[in-house]
Amino acid sequence: GKEGYPADSKGCKVTCFFTGVGYCDKECKLKKASSGYCAWPACYCYGLPDSASVWDSATNKCGKK
């Protein structure tokens, strides 16, 4: 698998700015990752499936129309 910042449907990082402990681990596991943590202010996942969308500065479309 791969690791990285999981991207939501808009291509944005999953924020953990105001979330509780364990939020990112749960979010990452929902995306079939093995684990995750809050790399403040965004979630970071380990063991993501290769098909998972991760945030990439080169292909960043967050906030763009």
From Swiss-Prot:
Expressed by the venom gland. Residues 2-63 form the LCN-type CS-alpha/beta domain. This is Beta-toxin Tf4a. The modification Cysteine amide is found at residue 62. Alpha toxins bind voltage-independently at site-3 of sodium channels (Nav) and inhibit the inactivation of the activated channels, thereby blocking neuronal transmission. This toxin is toxic to frogs but non-toxic to insect larvae (T.molitor), mammals (rats) and crustaceans (crabs) at the doses assayed. Has the structural arrangement of an alpha-helix connected to antiparallel beta-sheets by disulfide bonds (CS-alpha/beta). It comes from the Eukaryota. Disulfide bonds join 12-62, 16-38, 24-43, 28-45. It comes from Tityus fasciolatus. Keywords: Amidation, Disulfide bond, Ion channel impairing toxin, Neurotoxin, Secreted, Toxin, Voltage-gated sodium channel impairing toxin. The keyword Lipid biosynthesis does not apply. Belongs to the long (4 C-C) scorpion toxin superfamily. Sodium channel inhibitor family. Alpha subfamily. GO terms for cellular component: extracellular region. The keyword Transferase does not apply. One of its GO terms (biological process) is defense response. It is found in: Secreted. GO terms for molecular function: sodium channel inhibitor activity; toxin activity.
